[in-house]
């Protein structure tokens, strides 16, 4: 038996081994077991060995590798390149909708949709160690679109101050200097770049969906 760590989600999984020799043997054994015992096909393109000291390994939208820090290896993770392109395109497109709302849509509803997209990205990818770097790029592209498209002959419609914010918004974004408002709209535009890495921790035993006390931490994490 060789030491290994297995991470699985649905039919996608990663196996981490200490040496290349262990990885080769594990790959052969697992492939044979899946094909012979489970009667399932294994994709040669997706089933490969990656040296995470030299290359990224992608899993569930994250890309992961290790780097040397203070004489030991630590995990470095970020949003994978394909997801960066997809999320950036969605945010930029929604920013255009804020500047020019779609038919039967208001500027407020477009801002609320954009904010929900920001929360979704931040909540999912905040476990990545380089999340702030990726989100700064998103923020830069979005603000370029909003600044250019909300600029009028009488001045910019993009303001630094606006309506009141909720307690949850204050706790999450209250310290940010990147908050912006559209003139005449009280709803703030959430700054996607105002995010930092969250260390992954095991779920507390109190958290569950069946009691009021157990649901409280879940609702708090949503904002």
Where are these regions (language model features)?
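Non-catalytic terminal/accessory segments
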Residues: 1-223
